[in-house]
């Protein structure tokens, strides 16, 4: 098994940590965001998935979202995983292949043969926008409120804690829990504007997402036969 120690990374003066895939936590009740009806959220959940694999001999759990190119998730969710699956809202498992992997932006793209899921549109995030995060850390996809406090450039290491890269991102007001990495941030129009990747160590309810501006790093670099998904992370 390929392994690599992951390190705690910093965003400006705020301490962050990768959202661990180990264990489960209680989740807040689903609450529709302003401008998004309960009916719309039900439709959106058909495009959201739990992502599961085995990494460093431990179960890795994250979230993913269907877009035109495939299922988007975080690179740190699938790094070094074997037997990767996505689980839909009905609890059905589907074998997934990693067709793009970028540890610098913390993005990965998955392909599932024969899977039909409505592909959500992609839009740019706007400061102050209200929306939801579609997350699956509890083992089942659900929606939680997620408001965009700031749209920021993040100076951050790659998923292995190496180097320093500038990543387009956003600061969120959202109650993110372990396993929610890769959860899509959805705006009031029903578009994907980012993917959750971390939460603050210092401030409750503060989380961070990769902006949709970075998605092209994986949606335009697809290898249909699959790609090397790096070494697994010891969380």
Where are these regions (language model features)?
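Flexible, gly/ser-rich surface segments that form the specificity/activation loops bordering the active-site cleft
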Residues: 118-168, 176-180, 196-207
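C-terminal cap/linker of serine protease catalytic domains
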Residues: 24-41, 118, 139-141, 193-235
């Amino acid at each position: 098994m390929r392994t690599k120690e992951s390190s705690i990374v910093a965003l400006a003066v705020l301490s962050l940590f990768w959202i661990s895939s180990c264990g489960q936590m209680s989740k807040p009740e689903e609450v529709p965001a302003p401008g998004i009806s309960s009916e719309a959220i039900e439709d959106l959940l058909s495009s959201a998935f739990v992502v599961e694999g085995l990494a460093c001999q431990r179960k890795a759990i994250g979230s993913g979202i269907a877009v035109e190119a495939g299922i988007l998730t975080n690179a740190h969710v699938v790094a070094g995983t074997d037997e990767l699956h996505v689980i839909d809202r009905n609890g059905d498992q589907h074998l997934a292949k990693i067709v793009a992997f970028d540890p610098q932006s913390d993005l990965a793209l998955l392909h599932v043969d024969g899977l039909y899921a409505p592909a959500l549109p992609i839009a740019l995030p706007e400061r102050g926008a209200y929306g939801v995060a579609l997350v699956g850390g509890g083992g089942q996809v659900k929606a939680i409120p997620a408001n965009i406090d700031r749209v920021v450039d993040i100076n951050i290491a790659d998923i292995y804690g190496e180097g320093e890269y500038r990543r387009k991102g956003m600061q969120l007001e959202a109650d993110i829990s372990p396993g929610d990495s890769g959860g899509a941030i959805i705006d009031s129009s029903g578009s994907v504007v980012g993917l959750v990747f971390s939460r603050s160590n210092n401030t409750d309810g503060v989380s961070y997402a990769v902006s949709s501006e970075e998605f092209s790093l994986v949606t335009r670099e697809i290898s249909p036969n699959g790609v090397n998904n790096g070494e697994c992370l010891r969380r």
